[in-house]
Amino acid sequence: FDTMEIKQKECFCPNFIKFYELQKISKYARETWEFTNLYSKTRGVNRFLAVLEAFRLLGQRPEVHDRGMKLPDMTSLKKWTQEESKLGNPALKEYASQVNDADIDLALRWSLKVNEDIKELVYGMPPFPGVRESLEKLNEQADAIVVSQTPVEALEREWKENGIDSFVRVIAGQEYGTKTEHLAMAAVGKYPSDRILMIGDAPGDLKAA
């Protein structure tokens, strides 16, 4: 689905600026967010890792320092991403209930609002031309699954809305773990290694393969 632009520009980024109070550097926050998530090698990265990377890059921009902007401490979120492989809202919600950390709570509120906005705004988006026909052909010779770092709820909604969910055996989102873990769960040990094919549009897809 050609949804990355609308999701990142209209749902993720505005909430990134709002929740982390980046209004006085909004121009640079937007540039950095879009670079991180759309126009660089980290395109398609998990949303929480994207927050960490965006703040890392913002910390290197002189425009940010010139405006006296103090960036938030990402230590707590970074620690969680290093210890948890299922980087989704359910795991973060459980972690938040255990640690009583304001920065973790903020990341969770931001992520939940992003999901709300996506559900409200992103609909009626058809798959790329030729996808249905390709899936029909693929199903004649292969078992197909969805491998993504998008929440499962959004993935299932998009695939069902367009009537193509029946072409895949599993719809795996961020709640199932990393893309590498998705592939391992679904294919490794079940199919010869030279019969497993990962198709994607981001460096993270290549890395997972």
Name these PLM-found stretches.
Residues 165-178:
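A short, structured active-site edge motif that brings together acidic residues
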Residues 2-148, 153-156:
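Alpha-helical substrate-recognition element adjacent to the catalytic core
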